[in-house]
């Protein structure tokens, strides 16, 4: 307890495995009818964050943290926005530094452990709004940021933040990094690496001498990229040090509110340690749900506008 039974059945019949369940929704899924009002806020280090609001006059707010190289326009963000808005809940999707269409001012970017920016967003929301309750959610990397933030805050978390839910989340970052090294995951590594290299090239031009751009074409995998660039920009020794220190598995025991982790067993980007079964069994606050199917940020329901994860997060976060 609390290991939760799941009601997620099967995706469309032609979604043959976790790879199909991951890739096809990212290509095909479109969520229409979502509009944002953008607000830009300053960070304590003189950078900025773009916040995309979708307000319906709700008394509660869902705060969404997106995945690696994502933003508020990703299908998984728009799906949550549309579903929660239908239930008269306002939604705020915040864009990590350099995401959402604008390169940021400072040399640093973002990563799984950069909960300090989520803290900035939460403090801004608490100071500028009067919601009766706030829910935190995160997808993939955004889930790791959310868990890290909750663990770091512990008992100091604002009482207005009532529940949290994340899905497709690398709870154990070293394990997830090891999984990405598998030959079967070359597609994902190349996809992310292409985007990250372009962003690092832009950052290198913005700050000449900050990083060795001559090394960029030689980088072949995440370990090399995170050692050469992520670690150096953000104060870690190397990739291994980054994976360990940015991983939420070291902080989930300090989370002080009911929190759901929804990770599919066939998620191709998660390692075995990303399913904290033993801890969840002994916890009164961490709820773990592990459907057999779902892939990574997939959870497709045939003929449904929304996916299972979105319905499940709504159910968990709004239960009394």
Residue ranges: model-predicted function:
Residues 281-297:
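Catalytic histidine neighborhood in serine/cysteine hydrolases
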Residues 108-129, 148:
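Alpha/beta-hydrolase active-site loop
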Residues 292-320:
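Catalytic active-site module of serine/aspartate enzymes centered on a nucleophile-bearing elbow/loop
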Residues 127-131, 135-233:
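Alpha/beta-hydrolase-fold enzymes
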Residues 228-251:
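Active-site nucleophile elbow and catalytic-triad environment of alpha/beta-hydrolase enzymes
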Residues 255, 261-263, 267:
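Short beta-strand/loop motif that positions the catalytic acidic residue
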Residues 15-57, 300-304:
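N-terminal cap/lid segment of alpha/beta-hydrolase-fold proteins
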